[in-house]
Curated annotation (Swiss-Prot):
Entry function: Component of the intraflagellar transport complex B (IFT-B) involved in flagellar assembly.
Protein's organism: Giardia intestinalis (strain ATCC 50803 / WB clone C6) (Giardia lamblia)
GO biological process, one term: cilium assembly
Positions annotated as TPR repeat: 1064-1098, 1362-1395, 1397-1428
InterPro entries cross-referenced by the UniProt entry: TPR-like_helical_dom_sf, WD40/YVTN_repeat-like_dom_sf, WD40_repeat_dom_sf
Mapped WD repeat ranges: 63-103, 328-367
Name of the protein: Intraflagellar transport protein 172
Family classification: Belongs to the IFT172 family.
Amino acid sequence: MILSYSRNLYPQSTGEKIVMGIDWSPNSQKLGVLTADHSLYLFNDQGERQDKIGLRSTEVKSSNKDFIPLCGTFSPCSTLFVVGQSDKVAYIFRLGQLWTDKKSIVARIPMDDAVTAVSWPLSEATSELSPIIFGTASGNLYLYSFQSKSIQAFVSSACFASLASSKTTTADNQATPLSPMSSPIIKILPIPSMPQCFVAVAESGLAVYVDIKTQQLRAAARHSKAVTTACMIAQKTSHGRHYLVLADVMCKVTVYAVETSAALCVCNIKTPQNIPFTASTASPSGGGCIVANASGLHFLTLVNSQPVTVSYEASSSAVTVYQDSGKGFLPQITSIAWRPDVSVLTVGTSLGSVDNFTPTIGSYRYCGAEVVNSAPNRATINIPRFNGSKRFAAGSIDLHASMSSELRTVKAFPKHDFTSFVQNPSGYKSTNIYLLGIGDSSIVIYSLNDDTINEFRYNASLTDKFFFDVGACRTMVISNTLGEFTVCYLTTQSDPGCTFYKVDIYATMRGCVAPHASVISCYPIYEDAAGSLNRISKIRTVCLGEERTDVLVTDLMPPDMCDDFSDPIVVLFRTKTSRAVDWLFFGPSGNAVLLRDISGGVSILNITDYSITQLSTSVGNGVVQWADPFDVIVGQESPDAPLYVWYNPTDIEDAPEILQPPVPVDNESWSFSYVKSNPNNFSKITAGHVKNISVQAIMTTPSGRQTSVSLDTNLLLFNLLLDKHDILGACQLLSALQDNNARVTNRNLWQKLCSVALDSFNFIVASRCYAALGDLPLSITAREIHERVQNAKDGEAGMTHDRMNLYCQAQIALLNSDLDKYDGLMMSCGRIDEVLTLYKELNLYSRAEKICPESMINTLRTEAIQWLINSGQMTTAGMLLAQRGDVRGALDLLIQDRSYLSAFELAKRAMTSSADPSLAPIIELLIGKLEDSHHYSQAAVLCTLGSGRNHERALALFRKSHAFDEALELARQHLPHECLPIEREWAEWLFQTGQYDKATQHYLECMNQEMAVESAFRANNFKLVESLLMDIPAAETNAHLCFRLAEMKYISGDAAGAATWLLKADQPLLGLSAFICAGKFDEAIQFIRSNLPRQSYRELLVHEAKRIISLGSAPSNNPVQEKTKTLTSSGVFASSSGESSEKQNVQSFLNRMESLSHIRGVYSAIELLKLAGLYEDVADILQGNSMWDELYSFAKEHAASFSNYPDILRMVADAKRVKGDKKSCATILEELCMELYGLSGSSSGSSGGMGAATDGYTRLRTQASHLIQARRDVLLEASSMYCDLFMYLEAIRLCKRCGDMDALTDVCLLWVSSNANRSLLIQQLKQLNIIEPTLTKAADRGMWDVCTELSEYCPDPEAVRCDLFWRRGRKLEIEGRLKEAEEFYAKAGKHQEIVGMYLDTGKFEDAQQAAMEMTSNFERERAMRSIRESKARVLASEGKWREAEAEFIELGLVEDIISIYRSNQMWQDALRVAKEHGDSVLVENLSESYVKHDKLRSGLGTSASAFEPGAKADLGDGSGLAGRTKQHGSDVQTARSILEAGSSAGLRKMLMSAARSGSDVLFEVVLHRCAELASMVLNNDIQDSSIVEDIAIISPSIHNFEEIGSPHERVMSLAVAYLSKGVPLSVTTGTESKGTISLIISDVCNREQLLLVCRGVLSLAFVESEYVNRITKQETHGDGIFCRLRSILLSYRNMLLNTVRGTKAAETDKVNFIPGDQELSRCFEATHLIIQLAKLFIGAKTISSMRDIVLVSSSLVRYCDLLPVDRCFVVAGESCKQFVEISNGNSNAKVMEARTQYLNQCCVFLNKFIDLHEEISNHSRNLERIDISDLTGSGIPWTAQVPVNLYLSKSRADEVRAFILELTMDESTTTTQELPREPCPFGCGKPIWIGACSCINCRQVSPICAVTGCHVINPNTHMLPSSRACQICGCYARPAPWNSLITKSKNCPVCEEVGFPIGK
């Protein structure tokens, strides 16, 4: 804020004119200044001095001047001023409203001491009622009542001072005299928001909060120093707080919270020392305050209220305030005051000067005008040349939000109009412009057109929108985003006590879909009809509801004006439109609303009858508006389109008038703009100048031209004429319009005119209207009435005006056919004769009889009867005769008119009253007529009346009419023997007509219980049926009835009753189903326990559970039929009779129960089994439905109830892994590991525990040999998965809990290798004390940098480093990097290892060189001896026996050469050497061995295997079959003996015998059986009988075995299941068990038999759909047949590497995965590539992934001799084709090159497939006729066999053939019929196929890449990679694809262990 000097009000002077007080009046119009020279100066709001009042001393007439005024203030009404003086008196002066009013002293108020403070707040309704508060120098507070002119002591200084030590007190209503302890009251500060409260501030620093109403006092502040001045900052918001500002003698300013009396902050003001603050005042806006002292004014700003922050603005508070005013010195400021509107700050000084300062907060420009914020709640808009307001100074508009503390923003509506107005204020003309000032608590509005200001309290938000003139002038709507809007009316009535006009705020509407001015319209309804009083009673509002098709019409009233019997919102009606509404607007009369929908349609809403009429479907696309002030609508759809004028829009029959627009000028179209009416106000139209009315539609062109089209004034005037009661003129107007055919008038106008004419008794005009409406009779009648009225007026001079009015009203009633009213009115007129004459003419004798005299009644009746007979109304005539007593004549007329029923009633009355014999003939005639007309009951009644009663005839007639009640009553009285037949007949009739409930009782009456039960059934009266069945004895039909009753009870919801009766119907199982279908599982379990045998308890509940599950999965059209047919067909629900009809009834009932039941699905079945305690069956169901989460939770909850709990955890973990939820899988595996740990602990304690553990963990035994190994496998799996998720802490915790140090080191090693901060992790390893085991394992894995770091933390780092060097040398030696190995051996000091390394590789020269470098002679000699020994062994291996023998003998190694001779079966040479160089013992032992060998050889020759006639290949470990047999004992059978006896004993007994003989024997027997199964497949000789036992033994362990359709696949699935899953314990032990015996592949494995199994699996042929959809998915999930075969081969390889033969083969064979075995290696490679291709198929198809698919599928072609040949070629060809398609358009050079290569490869493969398909389709036995020249030298074998079935169907093969033909014929595609080639990677230069792994030129072979299947030879170095890709399985791979795969999956694709990237 900036204070700028404004003007001087009173100049400075010498003497005693010091300013003692300043106060502004509340209305900001008057300023009062008290000076020390005993004067009160008065100034106006412009600062002009108006008056001076001399003050009086204690005595009014005394001239004593020994006093000074100390304080003063205005009254709330601004007409009174009160002054407090030092001479213990106060005066009240009356100033008046105007300056010219007389000034006088109103009251003189004596006090006990000097008056130091005064306040006059508006605490009551008026100033006179509000008390004045005085504070004195003695510290007392007084209340003065202006009304009663009395003063009262309120609070004494003692009471005041007591609050210094207490929190609250009560006013004592006393005063204490001045004492040394007294403290003067210096300020009394009223609280604006609480008029009854104020704060009194004492000079001592104590401030007290006082409540006048409750007389309660509490401390508002306890300041420690004396206070010099005080003020209060009061925020004007509704929740604003009050802050007390105290300035003390130490020049410190402190802010207190009045509500809490807490000190909030201290303001630091830099002023000269010891200059106290003398005055202060708070800003009326609530934004801050000003304190003053000799150094100037200091402005304090309330920055924030949460928390409270008051800052000192130095820039707004400097002493330059007076320097700017031109004064050269700074007088002492004694008093300051704000003007209430915050526009002026008035300052008084010690020199008597009074100055005004103008505060300015800031300025900005808005719409071209400058907006100056002179105060926080005041804004001045400067508009030059604007002088149109009487309220403001020329050139400005002042917006003052007096109810707000801050004016937030200024807005103009409409904004563009205000912008134009600012530019040219004098020349701009607009409808209405409003300026809006939005404050924090109120809104101030200025209307430029009306020059009015309105202000009202409203807390506007930033999202609120304002709309003006909504439907009516000065109507404002405020809306928000919540669908709410508030209607305000800006009145022109002054608000009492305020300078602004009032604003009527109406109730807030809610639920509007889009509160906008376009969909809200208002219409003010005034208290008087003309609206001249300008008092609005309510506002009618039409708006949208919750949808855009919902229109709501309401009447709104201000809520504060409503009483208990009125509602501020009255909903008149709500309606729906067919389309969404775009905008709506009230008509000028408020009786109709114009609606436009979003499609351009225009409708009218009639407020009077709440109807909606559509005017047009398209006019709304243009301009549509009301022709104000008429309810006429004018619209134009588009420029130059006709104008549509609806003169009566609410009339649905009124067609619009079409007016053509003017002819276009200069190709400019005419558009409708607005309607111009003269006059424009309906109230100005008088009867005198009706003809001068003109209404024109103004048309404009784009260039600004205007023209007018006149509307039909006559039609506009019609309603005006009716309103002016000019009926004849209106009739002439309509007649003229109709006669001139100017416009076709509709019926409604004539009807309206007719109604008004009748109301005015103008019958001649009504006659004209009826004629126009086409009702000629009424027109004639109206004319006759007109004549009668005229005659009545002329003929009877005595008829008064009132009687004439009654006569006219009677005629109108006659026209309206209201004869009752006509009678009454005519009788009132005394014209009864005229009425009787009219009634006779109209034959209305009954009405005439009512009003005629008594003498004329008989005559009228006779005339009426005769007229009735003549007119054929004999029935009515007969009734009249009967009334006159002529019964016979009446009956005769009624019979003639065939009114037999009326005649019956008449005859019945006559015969009942008296028996007249003369009536007998006519009665008999009537009975015959009634019987002929089928009125039997009436005829029977007549038969029972009179003297000649005929009861038999009456009974027959009653029974014929089914009136059995009357017939039974008659029979009981007169014919008792007919009662029982009547009851039976009645019951049958009721049964036939469907009245079963009544029929039941009658059947019981006639003693037919069976039909009674049937009727009760059909009446759904089950209680009665139940009671009847209880009484019926047991019979064959009883069960059927019980069954029906049960069915009905179930349908009615009584499941328990249904089960009870089903039990009686011998259907207990159906009763069980009833309970279950009703969801009453507890009752079902209790029922089955009570009524069914115990042994079937579980089976029945499981069966019911499966039925419930089937219901949940059944199709919607027939959900239960297929699921329940098994029950009925097997007789489960059938009775003992077994009849088909009863089965159908049972089936129907069961189907109905299931259809009505909500119990279905897996969860219901689980709930049933859980309640029954069948937990294992629950687990089976959860497993079968793949509900793994539920299975895990349930099993964990009931773990003690499961014998196979570990199995369940294993299954859940596998399912989580398949879903990709590794974290959950790892957690479950951890729990499984802990479970197995407990089992392992219990197994180590006792043998019984081991058996339980084995039975409880059957599935895991297929993966390990015993429970301990199984636990370790799970531990490794769980920890590996944790490591994959980087959850190393969890993995370490698990390993520690299991106590597995090996696994713990593995995890730590992975953690170390994955984290860059190794030092921190190594410290953790040290804490775990596993550094050395981790180092050892890191060395085994080649992690040498980790080993180096770990070695530093070992006790002997140097020794550890030497060991690491040795280990690294050893690893390099294994890899063939001998030189590097020699270097590390040397660093380790292992020179002997160097020699041994070179000896192992046959490099004797390098070995000798290494030996010569040894420093020790002993070591050197030993090394040389080792070299000689190695050379000798080499000579022996090369067959140079003699040279080797000589060398061995020379070295003294006689036993070694003998052993070599012995191993090669050179027994003679061995004996010779032993005899020549050995001792006798050696010779003797050798001779015995020779003899045993001969015996053993002869024994084996007679019992050789069918697959290997000779002995088993020597694995180099020296343990043969005979040795193993000897070890087991003589009582154990061998595999061969078991196999020989197996053909007769059967497979099951053979496996049982093998299991008893040991694991190796069992493996041999099982492998032999698997080989037999494979031979069946390879020879295509499969007999179902030959595999029956295999299916019974092993098929339960195969998932979905029944779904396997191919017999070949079924057989090989059995074989693979034997080897992978083991043999069930139930087979080997003969007892029931779920466990299995795992098979361990050992050295007894027959390689040939295993090869047969591999070939059998690989030869399986599939069709395309099965291979893609089933086989591929199974292999991806890891549970396919190829995955299991790969696991078997990996186990065989591991076993082989643990033997001597395998170790030696691995050292020399780097190509084959299974060392030394090319065939098994090829089988393994083919199996692995099938799995790899399946995993690639499921991924996203990108160029990179498609390249991998092409490489793998092409590599599989190399194994077409093992795999189905057609599948190999077509899969490879299709993969190439897809790559070509997906890479089409790619401009990458490498992609384009690959595309060309693969296109050629695709052509070759698919061509070959077509040839194969044709040969196979022709049933060729071989493929020799196919040309394979294009495959020559590719490495693709062509010894393939014809597959069992074709991979592709004929249609798919035709598609391939068409593609090849199209590719061949396409000239734009250059393809060659040859495979793409590349230079030989081995370096010979021969071009070979890019997919080959061997070269026919250089005979070199490469291992395959585990990722792509291609060779792994580096084309640059022509060598194998320096190291294998996987250090665990030893597979090779190309670096790029391997690293890419490891990045994604983290695992080796072969062994699925953790893999690491490799270098190039």
